Structure formats: structure tokens, C-alpha cells
Amino acid sequence: MPLAELITTLTDYAIALQSLIFAGLLWQKPDRHPAVQGWIVAFLGVAIAALLRGTWHSSLGQLPEAVINSLWQGMILSLGLASFGMLAGAVQSTVPRRWQNWAMLAIFTKSLVYLSGASACQTFDCAIADYFSAMLIVLLLHIKPALNRVASARWIVGGVLVSAIAVGVEASGFSPGFLTHNDLYHLIQMVALYNFFRGVQQFRDST
């Protein structure tokens, strides 16, 4: 395996491990805020997607095409799960309870639309578009509490902004030394995931 593919695979696996750890720590959290469950789903979705993408990177040209395609489709679906979890968590922590059912219905509809077209998705762009459209909504929902100095919201807004930097690096194609733009994207995204985790850790009933 070329060095570039090896590093990309390892950083994918690092994201998977990090996300699994975060999900496990949140699951063990006593007296969890209802929004925490959505973020656990989000971290699990990211973990599965990263694991499948890393395996996909390492298996190109080595496994039957049908297996490669299955890995790809699994990754696309897992990112949809991550998007759903993030949005569910954001709604439960920011939207007034009288509106939460309507907001959750909108999230389910968005996810169903994405899943219905996921089988035809042959590039990473559609998954990234869904994932980061979810992040944009998360940002909008947390801006006001962040400005009001709610610690959890400030961490989550920070996570979205760091993710935006990661996307910018990915799009730029910047590849210093032996690292590719994909590797940098993964490393920066790990910082964003840590921000999300810290924010979710601090959820209170008042968030």
C-alpha cells in the first residue's frame, strides 16, 4: 500500500476509535440530558463511517468490486446516521419543547430524503453535503446560546467552525510533506469532534 493511502487509512481509523470512545463516555454519563442520546448516535455514525472509509481506502484493488461498493454504500449511510444524530441532539438541547416534535419530524424527513438517494451516490460530495448541511443547522441553533455564554453551545459552535476549516483544507488540496489534504482533513476533524464531545459533556437542562 502506498504511504499516502496508509496514512489516510490510519487517520480514518483514528477518527473511528476517537468517536467510539466519545460515544462510550457519553453513554456512561449519569443523568444524561435527553440531547446526549442524539450525539451518541452521531458519534457512532461517524465511527462506523470512518471505519468503513479506512477499510475502503486500504482495500482498493485488493477486494472484489462488489465488496468495495458495499463498503462505500455503508459509509454513505453511516454519515446519514451521524447527521441525524447531530440534528436530533441539537433540537433537544435548543428548541423549546412545544416545537420539538415538529422539528424532529423535519429531521426524519431530511434523513429519509437523503437515504432514498444514497444508493445512487457515487461520490463523497453528496454525503459531505448532507453532513455539513446538518452542521450548518446545528450552528444556527447554537449561535444564540453561545452568544449568551452557554459553555456547551460555545464548544459546539467551535466544533462546527473547526469542521469548516477542515473542509476548506480538503477543498484546497493542500498537501504538506508526506501528508495529503485528506490526512489534514481527518486530523482537523478530530479536533472538531473533541469540541463537540466537550460541548455535549456540559449539557444541562438549561442548555
Predicted regions span which residues?
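Conserved phosphate-interacting/catalytic interface
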Residues: 51
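Polytopic alpha-helical membrane-helix bundles and their juxtamembrane interface segments
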Residues: 1-46, 54-75, 80-207
